[in-house]
Structures are given as structure tokens and as C-alpha cells.
Amino acid sequence: MAAKDVKFGNDARVKMLRGVNVLADAVKVTLGPKGRNVVLDKSFGAPTITKDGVSVAREIELEDKFENMGAQMVKEVASKANDAAGDGTTTATVLAQAIITEGLKAVAAGMNPMDLKRGIDKAVAAAVEELKTLSVPCSDSKAIAQVGTISANSDETVGKLIAEAMDKVGKEGVITVEDGTGLQDELDVVEGMQFDRGYLSPYFINKPETGAVELESPFILLADKKISNIREMLPVLEAVAKAGKPLLIIAEDVEGEALATLVVNTMRGIVKVAAVKAPGFGDRRKAMLQDIATLTGGTVISEEIGMELEKATLEDLGQAKRVVINKDTTTIIDGVGEEAAIQGRVAQIRQQIEEATSDYDREKLQERVAKLAGGVAVIKVGAATEVEMKEKKARVEDALHATRAAVEEGVVAGGGVALIRVASKLADLRGQNEDQNVGIKVALRAMEAPLRQIVLNCGEEPSVVANTVKGGDGNYGYNAATEEYGNMIDMGILDPTKVTRSALQYAASVAGLMITTECMVTDLPKNDAADLGAAGGMGGMGGMGGMM
């Protein structure tokens, strides 16, 4: 086992604080509408330019191991805030630095670290409750656009695009961000349920100009098996032909004789048919077939539950207003499934999301909810260069997370004002002893840090602005973009409550642990020169055998 280097007390805390400051100072220059960019060197390709706090934090590793431990713990704050709310990483880092700096001063002055931590925790718990009372629901498109704009670093077009996307696919719909091809941002919306399986034969195409199959008011046959024998399908085909409607077959596969017969029937105009493979694999395929059945009011023909294809009737088939199939995708528009059944299915999938352990599973389940509940919107980010594209895409993703958080828990006044109001309301909060009171004061003073940093990044004097904002009440604050005072909500400067709450909670959690640290242990660096010397000595000993 390698030898260890151990530091105690003040020596350890000084080193740790130095690491915290290096990371936080690099991250906090990005805060606010006039925050600066940070350039990150990459081992290959062009450097990345970013204004995203967590991207900067993730790049930082320090040579001194004790300092690095401090930096890594604050990096954890940014990552946690990012995971919880998708934004607010810079705010969380600034809060953590402020609490740690003030807290370590109090420890150096002889306060009990455990009581300081209890005081900080008490102040933060009270602050979270206050934030909830200040929170205003965020439901209209205008507020959503404002939140998106602020999170995308005051880019109004991004805010409007996100609001439009949410408007089209609903709060539950999936919104994804992709690289665009032009210079302008674009929004593509797919309504209805779309899955990534195309037609099994190009002979099904009935719209040659678009290369697609379009079926109006079709019946939909869902089968959890391979279909290769046409005899199994004859009763259903005859019933559909009598009804005079087209038929869409979604099965594990349709092959051989069955596929050939369907193609011939379609080309002769006897019955209009199209066949596609079912989406997904294994258990996920079964689940997605069931989703389609719920959406279209049909039944999955599955041998597992004792159903046979030959005995299927028109009642077992689903229906939709329209189906569009191209080479790679199938879209079912306006399924006739009952609303109550669809909502029940959505609630069931939501329960699975709660219990899911892997991010991949959670993401796939979320997609299924969106396909059932709303639709899918794709924001295509346009930019002139690849470097700009990466930077802009990161901003759009941040803005998307922030708007989701805003819809979930509401919004508070932005620009650091909400925390200032919370701190002033908690001015009379007291702990069980004087050391806890100091901890409470440390946390309340730290709540001013985000506003001060935003102002500092504007090139203004933080103390003057902070005192002016403290002198006002309600949503009165400082608009750093225009450098004027006023009502933050009216000026459209909003922060999602969830983002502010998560930033404060994670910052206080890690800061509390660091304030109560008394000892740090790390591996001693290996001394390569000493190792080489030892090897040389051993070689000399080999020669001694000849002397005896």
C-alpha cells in the first residue's frame, strides 16, 4: 500500500479553500447576462468556448492533491445542481464558495464546526420554505419564453422557440435538441405517435412524389409474432376488405409468402395494406405494442395470452385518423383510443419512471409518455461554425431544463433578488447557541453572493447595488442587462424556483461537510528518481557473487 500524506486542522482547511477558490473563480466569471466566456483546451480539435458553469467545473483538475480535493467537492455541487434542475450550476458554485469562505473564517476564530453546520442547515431549510411562498406558477407561454431567454444567456429567439415547442407538444412532450444544417434555429414538431420503423416493402408506397405511404382512417393490426403464413391473416383481410378501409399491420416481422401476398393485393387494389416491424426489442417491444394498442383502441394479438391471429376480428383492431409511413419512420395521428385508458397507461409508465434505476431506462420511458401524451418537438440549432454550434447547443439544453423546472415548481424573481428577499425575511432566525447563530448569519450573508457576482461581472460596484436592492421590497431588483432597477418579474427576469432551491441546498450540503473537515489524507507522490536508484543498487549486488 502506498504511503500517505496527512494534513490536519488549519493546514488542511487552507489547502482545501485554495482549491475551492480556483474552481469557483473560474466558474463564477460566467454568471449573469454580462458573464464572460471561458475557453477550454481539448486534447484534439478546436478549443471549446462556453458560458456554462458545469462545463467549466468539469474541466478543472489541480496538481496539488489537497487543493484538488477542495476543487472536486465544489465540482460535485455544480454536477448535483445540474442533475437536479439542469441549470443553476454557477449560482450553486458561487453560494458554496461564499458559505465555505465565511464558515472557515468562523472555524479559525474558534467556533464549533458542528454548531456552525447546524446553523447553516437551519437557515437553508427555512430559506427553502420561504422560496416556496415567493414562488409564482409558470403556465403561460410568455413566462416560459422569459425563463428560456434568461437561461440561454438572454437569447430571445431560443426562449421563444422553447415556448413554442412546449405549446405544440404540451408540458409532457419530448423536446430534443439537435445540430441544425443552416444558420437559423428551426423547430420541427411531430404530432401523434412516431416510431423509428419504416415500410417493409417499397411496393406499399401510394404517394410516389413524397416516397411515403399514407393511409386514411385505417384499421391497425398489432401482432406480437412473426407472420410468414398468409392463411393466418385471411379472416382479418376479408373483414377489412368488406369494411372498405385500409389496413396497417404492425408485427415482429412480416416475411416470405405473407409479405408477397400483401404486396400483390395492394398493387391490384383489392385491399390497401401496409406492413411495418414493431418498434423496440424484447420486453420493450411488447410494452410499445401495448402503448400503440392503448392509443388506437386495439388489442395486441399475442400467443402469450392465448390469442390467435386466425380468430382476430375487427373489434381487435385499432383505428386512427391517419397513418404516414416513410422509409425510416411510422407516424400514427389521432388514434381512437379512450382518453381514460391513455391517461391510465401514462400513469403506469410514470410509476415505472419513479422506480427506474438507470438513466437510459428513464429516458426511454419518458419518450413513451411523450408519444402517448403529446408529441415530439425537435429544436435544430443553427450556427456559422462548429465551435459556436457546440456553445449554443449547450445553452439551448440549459434553457430547456430551466423551463421544465419552471413549469414544475414555478418561478421567483431572478438576478439573485429572491435570495436577498429570503435572507431579509430570516434576519430574526436564531439557533440554540451563539455558534449556531453565526452559522445562520454565514448562510444568510452567502445568499447575497449571486447578486454581487452578477453586478461584479457587469463592471459595477456590488455593495452599492446590493444595498439598493435590499432597500426595496417584493420583486424590486437590478436588471444587469440594461443596468437599471425595477420589478424583475415585469422585466421578464425570472428564475425557476427549483433551480434556486437546488443550488442553495446542494451548496449548503457540501459546504457544511467541508467546514467540518479536520483531516485530509492523500497518496504521497511517487518519487521516480528514488525508484531508479533502488533498481541500480540491486544490479550491483549481483556482482558480489563472483567475489566470494
UniProtKB/Swiss-Prot annotation:
Cited SUPFAM superfamilies: GroEL apical domain-like, GroEL equatorial domain-like, GroEL-intermediate domain like
Superkingdom classification of source: Bacteria
GO molecular function, one term: ATP binding
Reaction it catalyzes: ATP + H2O + a folded polypeptide = ADP + phosphate + an unfolded polypeptide
GO CC, alphabetical: cytoplasm
PROSITE patterns: CHAPERONINS_CPN60
Cystine pairs: none
Keyword annotations from UniProtKB, A to Z: ATP-binding, Chaperone, Cytoplasm, Isomerase, Nucleotide-binding
Record's subcellular location: Cytoplasm
Keyword Cytoplasm: yes
Protein family membership: Belongs to the chaperonin (HSP60) family.
UniProt-listed PANTHER family: 60 KDA HEAT SHOCK PROTEIN, MITOCHONDRIAL
Protein function: Together with its co-chaperonin GroES, plays an essential role in assisting protein folding. The GroEL-GroES system forms a nano-cage that allows encapsulation of the non-native substrate proteins and provides a physical environment optimized to promote and accelerate protein folding.
Subunit structure: Forms a cylinder of 14 subunits composed of two heptameric rings stacked back-to-back. Interacts with the co-chaperonin GroES.
Protein name per the record: Chaperonin GroEL
Source species: Escherichia coli O6:K15:H31 (strain 536 / UPEC)
Gene name per UniProt: groEL
